[in-house]
Amino acid sequence: MEKPKTIHDFGGFPQELFAVQYPAPGSPAIAMETKNTITKTEVGLDQQWGLDHGCWSVVKHLYPDADVPVIQLSLDYTKGPQYHYELAKELSSLRKKGILIIGSGNMVHNLGVLDWQNQDTGFDWAIEANTTMKNLITDGNFTPLINYTLQGKAFYYYCYGAAVTE
């Protein structure tokens, strides 16, 4: 789409956040090229949705003037990590054409257990999971991330909604 709207798909935050707009242009040509690059699944092009907070909240810090075209490709929540890893490998060919690919979202992101009174402090399991994930990514060791269910309690708590029981 030529002019994606800013989507505020969240709740429970200060009103100022809902007023943020990120008027970056879209690029139907890059969207079509992305669609044609992906062979492992069918990719639909949407003319309605726009850029949700998983996209604009990151890109607005990299390009505050909203002067680069942005397209958003959402994850398929019905598919597992291996599927998305393979999808990302397909997308990597776009980098050779000068297209920046950003995977956004927090590695440890569970607002259901956030302690709003102590926002500067993390849970031990969250710190452990975050540190381990960063180290694996830095080392290029993606197999444990794909097989996150085998990585111990810290990953279990994160990936399964921060269960508070053993």
Regions found by a protein language model. Give the residues of each.
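Active-site regions of metal-assisted phosphoester/phosphodiester hydrolases
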Residues: 70, 76, 84-102
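Short, basic/glycine-rich phosphate-binding loops at helix/coil junctions
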Residues: 9-16, 63-72, 146
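A short aromatic-anchored loop/beta-hairpin motif
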Residues: 1-45
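Short, well-ordered beta-to-alpha junction loops that form the rim of enzyme active sites
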Residues: 49, 104-107
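Short, hydrophobic/aromatic alpha-helical segments in well-folded domains
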Residues: 33, 87-91, 107
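Flexible, glycine/proline-enriched loop segments at strand-loop-helix junctions
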Residues: 17-25, 74-81, 158
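Surface-exposed, charge/polar-rich loops and edge strands
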Residues: 68, 79, 93-99, 107-166
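Internal, conserved structured core segments that host functional sites
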Residues: 31-85
